[in-house]
Amino acid sequence: MAVTPLIPVMLFDMDGVLVDVSGSYRRAIEETVYHFTGREVQQEMIQRYKDRGGFNDDWELTHTIIGDFGMETPFARVVTEFQRRYRGEDWDGFITEEHPFIQTETLLELKKLGHILGIVTGRPEVEAYWTLDRWGWREFFPLLIGRERQGNRKKPDPFPLLLALGRLNAAGIQVPAERTVYIGDSVDDVTAAHAAGMLSIGVVHPSADPQTHEPLLLERGANLVITDPNSLPEIVSWPNDWAGNMFEA
């Protein structure tokens, strides 16, 4: 008989957790800002905005940076130029430069351990599924909550995470928030998880400085911060090591 994991549901942010987007989303931000302002922005500057919170949406972040450089540009124009670079004319943009940040074998192991895996992301769902299909990952994620389903209640609002739990409950999978973990790389991810009553694991992605990003995520309420998502199978198997003693029999 299958044994139910102590943490049955694992919800993932996509960018910076499952996917290395330093050469795609981050590059699209840089080039779109340059297109409108002629000013160069570095990865460190983008990360500083992210660390302030409230910039989980890269379209909105790009629009804000352009405005901070003194250029008033309609949001729709920013999105058009961003997507022209990121998605491309025929799925031939920077999205093709993305690489997995987690190994397929890790996802397979989590599935074998009995975890239900889901994604809660700010990506449009068509882009999220394109990436999952590209790497053969769709089978691992029966649940995906993308940008379109979040309205004006994106992270750090807990709504997308609670929506994911609601979808599972509607499918007959009754799991309380406190037995669910959200794995994300930003302060908005940690804030959303905390507000939803979920456990939170922060990830320091390759373009972030672990000496500054790890303590920031812990300060915002992450239960644990890791640099390698491939360590997750062992970590979630022993939650008392990082989530207190709430899992004692």
Regions found by a protein language model. Name each.
Residues I46-K50, V78, R138-R153:
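A short, structured active-site edge motif that brings together acidic residues
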Residues N223-S231:
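Short acidic-hydrophobic, aromatic-tinged amphipathic segments that line or gate anion-handling sites
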Residues P5-M14, L18-Q103, L108-E109:
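N-terminal helical cap/lid subdomain that shapes the substrate entry/recognition surface
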Residues V17, I29, E105-W135, F141-R147:
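Substrate-recognition element of Asp-dependent hydrolases with the DxDx(T/V) motif
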Residues R138-P142, Q174, N223:
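Conserved H-loop
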Residues K155-V190:
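Conserved Lys-Pro-Asp/Glu-containing loop-to-beta segment of HAD-superfamily phosphomonoesterases
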Residues L18, L117, Y182-I183, V225:
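Conserved SAM-binding loop
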Residues Y182-L224:
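Acidic, Mg2+-coordinating phosphoryl-transfer loop and its flanking beta/alpha structural elements
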